[in-house]
Amino acid sequence: MTEQMTLRGTLQGHGGWVTQIATTPQYPDMILSASRDKSLIVWRLTRDESSYGVPQKSLHGHGHFVSDVILSSDGQFALSGSWDHTLRLWDLSTGQTTRRFVGHTKDVLSVAFSADNRQIVSGSRDKTIKLWNTLGVCKYTIQDDCHTDWTSCVRFSPNTQNPIIVSSGWDRLVKVWNLTNCKLKTNHYGHTGYVNTVTVSPDGSLCASGGKDSQAMLWDLNEGKHLYTLDGAGDTINALCFSPNRYWLCVASGPSIKIWDLEGKVVVDELKPEVMGTTSKAPTCLSLAWSADGQTLFAGYTDKLIRVWQVSMVSR
């Protein structure tokens, strides 16, 4: 028996590119998505044949594209970042904004919560990284040793024994920051084009980065060194996502999602949207999120859809 992915359905509701998707173990029947239509949608997963889920709430307030969204660990709150230069904290029970985070001077491209949900980090086209508390107060702005071009992505490590932030930038660098003093710990060199995205493994030991050079690079966060590179994306990498319970890394580039088994460094499966007709161009995959149980992969695209794949066993 071997594992492969099967397309289960789509989620339709956004009026623009689906830029990010968030899931939570607390609510397995809910996901949250962000879009260039300036809104966020809370979805209730019905898993029906006709539609995999229905929009339950739309969150409105941002004045420009919503670039990123993350859920608090209890699933009660969402944090979003937007090209309107702000972050917003949302109470999902009411659908209202509880805090606006003002301070960035350009588009906010990325937001993240620390493991304990007490700290928030954001990255922006103003090239800075800001640390905030949940009251919306900016506690620190990282400017020394920061990216010399747009800060494209920021992520906390889930490992509380090693409190770090990882960031990527259009200056081709992946940077690791010591959270205790906000000082630079490591510069990771290797990418030959801008870096779009970075993601940290569930145990905090690894991080993966990708962008223009279509190489997924893996870095050891404990040792601060380059481990290996997964080649063959062929297109700009827009999203990366570790499986929560398998040694897999999903790499989205162009219309394709490659699922790499990191043990054997082999592609387990490649997922592509079905395209009607020969003239239509396949949509680009921009965002990826696994369900907490690692059985379902959600992917957001430039055709405004979220596609849903499920892990299934097949006999060889």
Curated annotation (Swiss-Prot):
Any one of the GO CC terms: ribosome
Top-rank taxon, per record: Eukaryota
Pfam family, one: WD40
GO-annotated molecular function: ribosome binding; translation regulator activity
Keywords: Repeat, Ribonucleoprotein, Ribosomal protein, WD repeat
UniProt keyword annotation of Metal-binding present: no
The keyword Ribonucleoprotein belongs to this UniProt entry's keyword annotation: yes
WD repeat start and end residues: 4-46, 52-93, 94-135, 137-180, 181-221, 222-263, 264-312
CDD domains: WD40
Signal sequence annotation: none
Disulfide bonds: none
Protein family: Belongs to the WD repeat G protein beta family. Ribosomal protein RACK1 subfamily.
Protein's name in the database: Small ribosomal subunit protein RACK1
Organism: Biomphalaria glabrata
